[in-house]
Design a protein with these regions (language model features):
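Active-site cavity-forming subdomains of large catalytic enzyme subunits
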Residues: 1
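Thiamine diphosphate
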Residues: 7-13, 21-38, 43-224
Length: 224
């Protein structure tokens, strides 16, 4: 009835319940007592369950709450002042150099636009974003859409630069072939974390892009 519809509209549970899940939540994921109560209650009931837990990135540390992108992956640092440890503080990275250069070129050429998949800071695009916000597009964790979107922009005369980590570019291989390569669209792929990436762990090793991109005849350039 109306009560059930109201509950579903409020908690967005319809999709999960339509799939046969019992929906619970949303609850505060930072409240350990509440979270434990919910988990114990769910475990005592039969059937599949969906627990909706709401959290905030960086919760409890003001600098991270204010700027979560800068705290996506960090080394040791002075917690009181949010200053990196001098012994592990990174030198100017490839991503920073690239980001500053693209930002400069964006000021010289209004056709240039930047696209990323939830990696604005990781690919150095924060500079372009602040200077050219109307030509910056973060599509979220949707690499396939990022590539197809870039092909669409290129077809209309724009010069899209797609900035994605090598290991995540693999997800969009079908779109690279069909939407960019076969249609001969002018899209630039700025591939971050290419090659061996010790600091980012096993999942972020960019060791396949030379093989799968050269297979479809895409020119590959690497800074010396």
């Amino acid at each position: 009835g109306g009560k059930s519809m109201g509950r579903r509209a409020m908690y967005h549970s319809t999709m999960f319940e339509d799939m046969g899940f019992h929906y619970f939540g949303p609850i505060d994921g930072h409240d350990e007592a509440e979270l434990e109560r919910a988990l114990r209650a769910i475990c005592s009931q039969p059937g599949p369950h969906f627990l909706h837990v709401v959290t905030k990135k960086g919760k409890g540390y003001a600098p991270a709450e204010a700027n979560p992108g800068n705290f996506h992956g960090v080394s040791t640092f002075d917690l009181a002042h949010s200053i990196p440890d001098p012994e592990v503080a990174p030198k100017e990275s490839f991503s920073t150099v690239f980001g500053n250069l693209l930002n400069k070129q964006g000021s010289e050429n209004e056709k240039i636009c930047a696209i990323t998949a939830a990696m604005k800071y990781g690919t150095g695009l924060q500079f372009f974003y602040h200077t050219h916000p109307k030509r910056f597009f973060d599509v979220g964790m949707a690499e396939q859409h990022a590539v197809t979107f870039a092909a669409g922009l290129a077809s209309q005369g724009m010069l899209p630069v797609v900035c994605i980590y090598s290991t995540f570019l693999q997800r969009s291989y079908d779109q690279i072939i069909h939407d960019v390569n076969l249609l001969k669209e002018n899209v630039v792929f700025a591939i971050d974390r290419a090659g061996f990436v010790p600091a980012d762990g096993e999942t972020h090793q960019g060791i396949y892009d030379p093989a799968f991109l050269s297979q479809v005849g895409m020119p590959i350039y690497s800074p010396s």
